[in-house]
Curated annotation (Swiss-Prot):
PANTHER family: 60S RIBOSOMAL PROTEIN L12, LARGE RIBOSOMAL SUBUNIT PROTEIN UL11M. It comes from Spinacia oleracea. It is found in: Plastid, Chloroplast. InterPro entries: Ribosomal_uL11, Ribosomal_uL11_bac-typ, Ribosomal_uL11_C, Ribosomal_uL11_C_sf, Ribosomal_uL11_CS, Ribosomal_uL11_N, Ribosomal_uL11_N_sf. Belongs to the universal ribosomal protein uL11 family. One of its GO terms (biological process) is translation. This is Large ribosomal subunit protein uL11c. Residues 1-66 form a transit peptide.
Length: 224
């Protein structure tokens, strides 16, 4: 006995949602080849009944950080070294000619220098001025020369022409330590004891004694 043929359902008869598993299998090559009516397959495609599963692949994100462009670096066009009396810098020589040749604002430098050295009247303060290509400048104050500090401490006006025979003054060990402490940043040493010996040597060459003395005279040895 022949079985009755069942007609394939038309697209209009499908009203309920199709399960995900069934939708995934409808577009496989095997399922499409079994359809007796190719028009049904086109209906499935046109009505978007196939629901593709969400992608599980990971997308790689590349983050590019843009570093800020650095500003234009200033170029040093000159370094000027001067020794000026504290609080008394003026546009007169040597300041005016030295800075004017580099295009530096002379009055601005004098004002800044005098303000920073106002607490050291009577001292000669060395200064190192760095000039840039945009006419701006910076400067560093050095400590006064050791000879100036020794004359101030001893009360002498100038050093001796013959320091071995003629003495012009005397300082205490505490005064020597104070001068060495002030000069330490500019000396080629790291300890206060070494700085004191360096300053003591300068004092000896100027005819200034130290009480008590810290430098021991070397004895001459006679070799027969």
């Amino acid at each position: 006995m022949a079985q009755p043929l069942v007609a394939a359902p038309s697209s209009s008869s499908i009203t309920s949602p199709i399960p995900r598993k069934l939708c995934s299998s409808l577009l496989t090559p095997s399922s499409l080849s079994l359809s007796s009516n190719p028009r049904n397959s086109l209906q499935f495609l046109n009505s978007k009944l196939f629901l593709s599963p969400p992608s599980t692949s990971h997308r790689r994100l590349s983050i590019v950080a843009m570093a800020p462009k650095p500003g234009k670096a200033k170029k040093v066009i000159g370094v000027i070294k001067l020794a000026l009396e504290a609080g008394k810098a003026t546009p007169a020589p040597p300041v005016g000619p030295a800075l004017g040749s580099k295009g530096v604002n002379i009055m601005a430098f004098c004002k800044d220098y005098n303000a920073r050295t106002a607490d050291k009247p009577g001292f000669v303060i060395p200064v190192e001025i760095t000039v840039f290509d945009d006419k701006s400048f910076t400067f560093i104050l050095k400590t006064p020369p050791a000879s100036v500090l020794l004359l101030k401490a001893s009360g002498a006006e100038k050093g001796s022409k013959d320091p071995q025979m003629e003495k012009v003054g005397k300082i205490t060990i505490d005064q020597l330590r104070g001068i060495a402490t002030e000069k330490l940043p500019d000396l080629n040493c790291t300890t206060i004891e070494s700085a004191m010996r360096i300053i003591a040597g300068t004092a000896a060459n100027m005819g200034i004694d130290i009480d008590p003395p810290i430098l021991v005279k070397k004895k001459k040895e006679v070799i027969f």
